[in-house]
Amino acid sequence: MKIAFCCTNTPPEPWLLGLRAALPGADVSVWQPGDAPADVAVVWMPPQAFWDAQPRVRAIFNIGAGVDALMAQRLPAGARIVRLDDAGMGVQMAEYVCHAVIGYFREWAAIDHDIRAGIWQAREPEPRTAWPVGVMGLGVLGERVARAVQTFEFPVNGWSRSPKAIVGVRGFVGPEAFHDFLAHTRVLVNLLPLTPETENILNRDTLSRLRPGAFVINV
């Protein structure tokens, strides 16, 4: 079995070592133009020239959760696409979102400005109930983020295509519930994949339906 590794801006050594250790009988290498066609591709944002040279690939392993760039390319017919659901990205996204939400809630930017200006001004925080967080997309990563935000006792709403049962998260389902979801959101977190249905979903109309003074976290 020949495995071709073609990942933009990704050091190949850890992947090659791991694949060779797990599959000692496989021929694993970094793809170079002119190489023989592979049976399996491990990729991240490969050039179209890579796919044009892979007529027999049976499986494509995308080393990230997002496959929108991949789906925009001409891929080998019949190849199965496998993407990572989490692989460590969940906790990174959760900590990023929680850091941002708490920063807005505690007015860290204003406090930092005051410190730089030599001003001491006490700030009384609003109750957490005034800061509902709305998560768009409740897949593996979205659920991880929603649960993390919950630990800080903020109200959490979630919007998804199909019903999701996450304890403590108020669910809004489908296009008919989207505007209601936005109206109940002060911090909007976007974890939706880029598809024809979600492209440009963040627009003037969408943002105008959020609570006044809302924030958007696009991850």
What is the predicted function of each stretch?
Residues 27-37, 48-51, 168-185:
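Short acidic low-complexity segments
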Residues 1-40:
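N-terminal glycine-/charge-rich "phosphate-binding" loop or analogous flexible N-terminal tail
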Residues 78, 129-132, 213:
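Phosphate-coordination loops involved in phosphoryl transfer and adenosine-cofactor binding
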Residues 151-168:
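NAD(P)-binding Rossmann-fold cofactor-contacting core
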Residues 111-144, 171:
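Glycine-rich NAD(P)-binding loop of Rossmann-like domains
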Residues 39-112:
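Phosphate/diphosphate ligand-binding glycine-rich loop within oxidoreductases
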Residues 2, 132, 154-155:
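Residues at the starts of beta-strands that form the adenosine-phosphate
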Residues 163-219:
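Rossmann-like adenosine-cofactor binding region
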